[in-house]
Design a protein with these regions (language model features):
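Intrinsically disordered, low-complexity regions enriched in small/polar residues
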Residues: 20, 29, 38-39, 213, ...
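Intrinsically disordered, low-complexity charged segments of secreted bacterial virulence
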Residues: 1-98
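Short linear motifs at secondary-structure transitions and domain/linker junctions
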Residues: 47-51, 62-65, 73-80, 120-128, ...
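Residue-level detector of solvent-exposed, low-hydrophobicity positions
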Residues: 10-13, 25, 162, 218, ...
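Gly/Ala-rich beta-loop-alpha elbow adjacent to hydrolase catalytic centers
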Residues: 207-216
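Lipolytic serine-hydrolase domain surface
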Residues: 92-96, 106-202, 220-331
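Mixed-charge, polar/low-complexity N-terminal
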Residues: 82-84, 211, 234
Length: 331
């Protein structure tokens, strides 16, 4: 990844050239007498140092043995469009796989720590994507054997809301659709570009967790590329009507645990699993056979859960065998 090394070199030069690295302020005590300078860090310089640390973490993660064995690639890295790095990580052969999922994570996700951990580790959103790939039992890693292949993109091409923005009540908080709406056109363009550059016509799945599912909903309004959509822990996908999202009703799935208060809210267009007019099919989260129950807001793609198997069946382009018995999508 020569261009990543170039970005690191360029940022090192920016840091070396940046002035002033600190701010000096003259302080005169009341009543006169000797004054003195106080020196404080320059916030812009400190922000640049943090971005260099992030960039180094990204490089270490992608060059790790684990990433090489998983065939991970850096598809997007943008340092200019928002407050944080925006990135997209590929797992598997994105250009040639039969089945491709584009997964958009939600609130508090950043490029690092997030998609990429510290000290060469991998963040949980990428692991969530790869849990789905593993459970699909399709070939996706270099050396995997199988007639059908799969790949996933963990897409963070937007500024996901964080707790600071939410507690301050800004319009970039999770209580506002602003960031999801801003993400929509870029994510739609990514879907379209992936389909156009793919060798053959892939089975393309749009996937999203939490606030990322809302961004997914805005993207679906602007792209016809995805064949299926599956969301989990969703506060709403902008609409529960298939025609609004450009989808067929039997290609829309959603997952919500019984104690996920985010999914219960239906804040952005209604709850896909409980709205009476929803075209989404609700997938089961209860224990079934050897599969365990999912609880809360963040366990949907945990290994061994019923919800993970249901989601992976969507990636395989199969009708899920784990449909909630109260699903409003069952006719």
């Amino acid at each position: 990844m020569a261009w990543l090394a170039y970005m690191q070199k360029e940022m090192d030069q920016q840091i070396a050239d940046f002035e002033p690295k600190s701010n000096k302020i003259w302080y005169s005590p009341p009543g006169g007498g000797g004054g003195y300078y106080t020196e404080t860090p320059n916030p812009e310089y400190e922000a640049l140092l943090r971005k260099r640390d992030e960039l180094n973490n990204i490089s270490a993660s992608l060059n790790s043995k684990e990433s090489r064995e998983a065939g991970r690639t850096l598809l997007v890295l943008d340092n200019s469009s928002g407050d944080h790095f925006r990135a997209a990580v590929g797992s598997g052969d994105i250009d040639n796989a039969d089945h491709v999922m584009v997964f958009t994570p939600g609130m508090t996700t950043q490029a690092t720590p997030g998609l990429f951990g510290k000290d060469g580790s991998t963040g949980s959103p990428v692991r969530n994507s790869e849990n789905i790939l593993d459970k699909s039992e399709l070939a996706w890693k270099p050396g995997d054997k199988g007639q059908e292949t799969a790949a996933a993109v963990t897409w963070l091409g937007y500024d996901a809301p964080n707790w600071s923005e939410t507690l301050r009540g800004t319009d970039s908080s999770v209580l506002s659709s602003k960031e999801a709406q801003s993400a929509g056109p870029d994510l739609a363009s990514f879907y379209d570009g992936l389909q156009e550059t793919h060798h053959g016509d892939p089975h393309l799945v749009a996937a999203g967790h939490s606030y990322g599912s809302t961004a997914t909903g805005y993207a679906l309004r602007e792209s016809n590329a995805p064949d299926d959509v599956v969301v989990w822990g969703s506060p709403g996908v902008t609409s529960v009507d298939a025609s609004d999202l450009g989808m067929l009703p039997d290609h829309m799935s959603a997952v919500a645990t019984g104690d996920d208060v985010v999914a219960m809210s239906g804040r952005y267009g209604g709850s896909p699993t409980s709205h009476p007019d929803s075209d989404f099919t609700s997938l089961d989260t209860h224990a079934t056979g050897d599969l365990t129950e999912s609880t809360g807001h963040s366990s949907y793609t945990d290994k061994g859960t019923t919800s993970l198997e249901g989601i992976s069946q969507i990636l395989r382009n199969q009708q899920s065998t784990h449909i909630d018995h109260n699903s409003i999508g069952i006719q």
